[in-house]
Amino acid sequence: MSHSVEDIKSESRRLRGSLQQSLADAVTGALREDDQTLIKYHGSYQQDDRDIRDERRRQKLEPAYQFMIRTRTPGGVITPTQWLALDGIATRYANHSLRVTTRQAFQFHGVIKRELKATMQAINATLIDTLAACGDVNRNVQVAANPLLSQAHATLYADAARVSEHLLPNTRAYYEIWLDEERVSGSGSEEEPIYGERYLPRKFKIGFAAPPLNDVDVFANDLGFIAILRDGQLLGYNVSIGGGMGASHGDAETWPRVANVIGFVTRDQLLDIATAVVTTQRDFGNRAVRKRARFKYTIDDHGLDTIVAEIARRAGFALQPAQPFAFDHNGDRYGWVEGEDGRWHLTLSLPAGRIADTDTAAHLSGLRAIAQLNVGEFRMTPNQNLVIAGVPASERARVDALVAQYALDAGNRAATALARGAMACVALPTCGLAMAEAERYLPDFSAALQPLLQQHGLADTPIVLRVSGCPNGCSRPYLAEMALVGKAPGRYNLMLGGDRRGQRLNTLYRENITEPEILAALQPLLARYASEGDHANDEGFGDFLHRAGVIALPPYPTHRRLDLELLA
C-alpha cells in the first residue's frame, strides 16, 4: 500500500520502518515500497539499470535493481588511507568507479541488495558514514576548497563539521540496521529536538563559501555561510537563506531561486542560527504539496521579513548587518598552487566527477597510486574535481611522476576552457528522474561545441557549462552561463545568461531542442560575444548576453539581483 512521504516518516519508528525485513527478503532485489523512501535517510537510493529495463521486461524479469550509496563527508576532505579504503569498496561492491558529487560527497553505484549491508559496514569502517546523506534532512555540508587560504580553510572546515554533526538525526536506527548495534529497551524515545517525528518537509542544503571564490555556489543553498575575512582573520559569516535549484518543466508554481543575504553572525553563533533556520523550515514549510516544500517557497509564501524575524526569535538574537564581500568566480583553477603555509595543492579536473579505469583513462589506478604515497589529503571540490592538498614541496616530484604516468591531468589539458570547467549530473542509466543523458552526453556535447569556440577564438575563454538530465538541477544548471536541462531523450532546454560568480540565474532561451538546434542557436551568440564582448575587462559570456540585450532576467516571482551594497 502506498503512503505519503509524510505518513511514511511519521510511522517509521525513527527511520526504521521494515528495512531489516526488506533487506532479508531474498525473493526480490528491491525493497518494500515504504522502505525505498526510508533508506534515503540512511544514505542510499534504490535504482535500476534503465539501459536494460525494457529488455528485462520482455524477458518477464524484474528490473535490474541496484543501489546508490552516498557518503556524508563535510567539505569533501578525506585522508589517503580513507581514499584507498573507498577505492577498495568501489572495486569490491560497486561498479568499479567512484563519483564525486557537486556537494563534495562520494557516490557508489551498482551495489546489489544482498551486499548493501556489507558495503555500509565497510564505509563506516573507514570512519566515514552515510547517515543523512539523502532524505528530508540536512544533507552533506559544502565547504570552499580554496587551497590558497590554508588556515581559513581549516577553520571553515571545522565550522562546517560542527554544523553537520549538530544537525544529524538522533535516531539509532542507522546503527542498529547497518552496524548491528543492539537496541537497549527503556533507553528513551530518541527525541529529535531539531527534526521532530516527521523530519523536514524537504531536503535541506548548507554551504560555506570563502570569498572571492564561490565554488560552492552558496546562493543555491537553503542556508549559506559566507566567510568574512579581514587581514587573514575570520570575523564570522554573512548568512544567506532560500536558495534552491529544483523546478518542474512547465509548472509555474516551481522555480529556481538565488538566496537572500540576511545579516552577519559570529562563529560562536553558528549553531544557534543553523538550528533556528532549520526549525523554522520544519514548522513553516509546506508539508501538503511536496513540490512546494523547499525552504525557498516557505520564504516566498510567508515573506522574507516574516521568516527573518522568526529566525531571530528562535536564535535569541538579531543578526548584525551583513558585511561587504565580493565573489569573482565559481570555478576551479587547475594545476599546482602554493598555500600560505608553504604546502602545495594540485587541482585535477575530473570530467563529471567520475573516477574509473577506462580505455582512455586510468583515474582510479592513478589516484590509488598517489594515495599510496600517503602525503597530504584529498579534497573534493563542489565542481566535481579533486585537490591533492597539503603536499610538502619535497613530495611534488613523486606526485607529478604519477600524474604523468596515469595522465591524470588530461582533463586539465582539455581543448577548451569550457570543457575543463563543465559539470553534469549522473542522469541515465541509474537516476530514475532523468529525462535525458547528462554525464554520458557531456563529452560529446563539449566536443561538438569545440569547433565553434575555436572558430571564434574562444577556446581559452572560460564559459560555465552545466548539463542536467532533468529540471531538478543537481548540477546547479540554473546558475550557469550556458546550461542544457533534459526534456526528453536527445532534447534539452537551452538556458543562457548566468554568470561566472554564481550570483545570477539564467533564462530559458530555446525549449526542447536537439543538439544541431542547440549549436545553431549558439553560433551567432558566440560570434557576437567574440567580436563585441569586453574581453579586455574579462566580460563573461552571460554578462555579455545581458549587456547586449539578448537575455533578460528570468520571470520567476522572486528573482532579484544581489544587494549591490554588499559587493565591496
Swiss-Prot record:
GO terms for biological process: cysteine biosynthetic process; hydrogen sulfide biosynthetic process; sulfate assimilation. Pathway: Sulfur metabolism; hydrogen sulfide biosynthesis; hydrogen sulfide from sulfite (NADPH route): step 1/1. Its EC number is 1.8.1.2. The keyword Iron applies. Its cofactor is siroheme; [4Fe-4S] cluster. GO terms for molecular function: 4 iron, 4 sulfur cluster binding; heme binding; metal ion binding; NADP binding; sulfite reductase (ferredoxin) activity; sulfite reductase (NADPH) activity. [4Fe-4S] cluster binds at residues 425, 431, 470, 474. It catalyses: hydrogen sulfide + 3 NADP(+) + 3 H2O = sulfite + 3 NADPH + 4 H(+). Binds 1 siroheme per subunit. Binds 1 [4Fe-4S] cluster per subunit. Gene3D superfamilies: Sulfite Reductase Hemoprotein, domain 1. InterPro entries: CysI (IPR011786), NiRdtase/SiRdtase_haem-b_fer (IPR005117), Nit/Sulf_reduc_fer-like_dom_sf (IPR036136), NO2/SO3_Rdtase_4Fe4S_dom (IPR006067), NO2/SO3_Rdtase_4Fe4S_prot (IPR045169), NO2/SO3_Rdtase_4Fe4S_sf (IPR045854), NO2/SO3_Rdtase_FeS/sirohaem_BS (IPR006066). One of its GO terms (cellular component) is sulfite reductase complex (NADPH). It holds the Pfam family NIR_SIR. PANTHER family: SULFITE REDUCTASE [NADPH] SUBUNIT BETA (PTHR11493:SF47), SULFITE REDUCTASE [NADPH] SUBUNIT BETA-RELATED (PTHR11493). Component of the sulfite reductase complex that catalyzes the 6-electron reduction of sulfite to sulfide. This is one of several activities required for the biosynthesis of L-cysteine from sulfate. Alpha(8)-beta(8). The alpha component is a flavoprotein, the beta component is a hemoprotein. Belongs to the nitrite and sulfite reductase 4Fe-4S domain family. This is Sulfite reductase [NADPH] hemoprotein beta-component. It comes from Xanthomonas euvesicatoria pv. vesicatoria (strain 85-10).
